[in-house]
């Protein structure tokens, strides 16, 4: 997808947004196409959502925040405002997140009809230049919001299919080509003050979520980052050394989780050298990045390896100025790939797996949430979560930037999340 460009003239900007809108909506439909109606309503755990709900909720976002601002617009179905509101308390009550799997109605076809109807209304307004500047900023946010749900649709259906006793595949694609991972090397940086974060949007022309702002200075100590993320083979060494059998390198809550949940290896692994993928069970590639780790597992591995997780400032310092290139949903592999064996540079900063950091998800100094209902988007979740950076094989490339902050609780395992090592230097 091409980036939004600040073209001259309000009407021309809206045409650019029209193209991005159509591309984004089409990708969601393509990702959902392999799902049967039964697949699309499964909710395998409270943290996940049915595919049908993702399709409807992203549509509700455009209808609720863009179309309903037009007094002439007629709501598709007023009852659906309750069903497909996620967490916007200022908008009204909502169906419980953990109960989304009971929504056998509306049907998948009705949800598709809903998407089509809203798309017609949105495209008419964008084509005719009938949205003011404020509405166009919400369109841009809605596109970014839908890209987030594209990744969640994939990770949620992967968990649902794995939870099915038959463990069917989402699709049947050829296995991605294996690459011999480069030798792990360290890239050292001296102590310095660095500036991280993004300029506030929409005051800035470049989109960024409110949790990425404001730009601010951070003292970063002398440290080194690994040139690539940790591989399956390296994580297997941790397992073979008894990593899941002793509390030694685990945080207290992490070890309690290992015991309570019976963790013995990353999610989707088995003991026979296989892993469950969106293409079904596959032989585990030893050179591919280890994924589906919780922060607890990533942290325990780093301690075992005599290292630590990078801070988000260290990660952003390394990623600033680096092109957003890698293995994303755009490549259609839908599985992490090994880094190419090269001698220089830091690899895999973008794509393949989200990288857990050692930074709690907290507001930056001077953080200000967006005004109105959209102020609920990020800020109210800034507790008991950790920052991840870089995107994954399920993230759209155009969604990412060096300042992007993802966040999940310490025990979350169903995302494409891995680990890059860091260490302090004297």
What is each PLM-predicted segment?
Residues 1-49, 53-121, 125, 133-140, ...:
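Disulfide-stabilized, aromatic/cysteine-rich ligand-recognition loop
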Residues 142, 146-148, 152, 156, ...:
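Functional-site microenvironments in short loops/helix caps that host divalent-cation chemistry
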């Amino acid at each position: 997808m091409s980036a939004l460009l600040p073209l001259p003239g309000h009407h021309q900007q809206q045409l650019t947004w029209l193209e991005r809108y159509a591309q984004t909506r089409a990708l969601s439909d393509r990702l959902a196409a392999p799902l049967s109606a039964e697949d699309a309503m499964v909710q395998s755990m409270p943290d996940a959502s049915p595919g049908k709900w993702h399709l409807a909720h992203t549509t509700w976002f455009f209808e609720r925040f863009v179309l309903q601002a037009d007094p002439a617009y007629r709501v598709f179905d007023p009852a659906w405002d309750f069903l497909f509101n996620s967490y916007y308390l200022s908008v009204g009550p909502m169906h419980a997140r953990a109960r989304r799997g009971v929504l056998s109605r509306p049907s998948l076809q009705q949800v598709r009809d809903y998407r089509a109807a809203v798309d017609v209304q949105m495209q008419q307004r964008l084509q005719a230049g009938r949205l003011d500047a404020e509405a166009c900023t919400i369109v841009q946010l809605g596109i970014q919001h839908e890209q987030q749900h594209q990744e969640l649709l994939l990770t949620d259906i992967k968990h649902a299919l794995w939870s099915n006793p038959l463990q069917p595949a989402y699709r049947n694609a050829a296995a991605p080509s294996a690459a011999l991972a480069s030798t792990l090397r360290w890239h050292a940086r001296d102590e310095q003050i660095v500036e991280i974060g993004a300029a506030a949007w929409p005051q800035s022309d470049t989109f960024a979520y409110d949790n990425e702002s404001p730009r601010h200075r951070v003292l970063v100590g002398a440290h080194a980052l690994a040139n690539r993320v940790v591989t399956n083979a390296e994580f297997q060494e941790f397992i073979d050394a008894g990593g899941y059998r002793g509390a030694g390198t685990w945080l207290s809550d992490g070890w309690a989780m290992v015991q309570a949940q019976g963790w013995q290896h990353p999610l989707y692994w088995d003991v026979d050298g296989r892993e469950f993928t969106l293409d079904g069970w596959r032989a585990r590639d030893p050179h591919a990045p280890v994924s589906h780790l919780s922060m607890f597992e990533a942290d325990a591995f780093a301690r075992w390896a005599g290292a630590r997780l990078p801070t988000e400032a260290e990660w952003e310092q390394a990623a600033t100025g680096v092109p957003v290139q890698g293995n994303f949903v755009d490549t259609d592999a839908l599985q992490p790939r090994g880094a190419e064996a090269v001698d220089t540079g830091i690899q895999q900063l973008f794509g393949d797996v989200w990288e857990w950091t050692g930074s709690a998800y907290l507001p930056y100094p001077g953080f200000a949430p967006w005004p109105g209902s959209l102020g609920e988007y990020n800020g109210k979740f800034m507790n008991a979560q950790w920052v991840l950076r870089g995107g994954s094989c399920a993230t759209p490339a155009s969604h990412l930037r060096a300042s992007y902050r993802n966040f999940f609780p310490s025990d979350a395992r169903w995302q494409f999340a891995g680990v890059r090592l860091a260490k302090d230097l004297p």
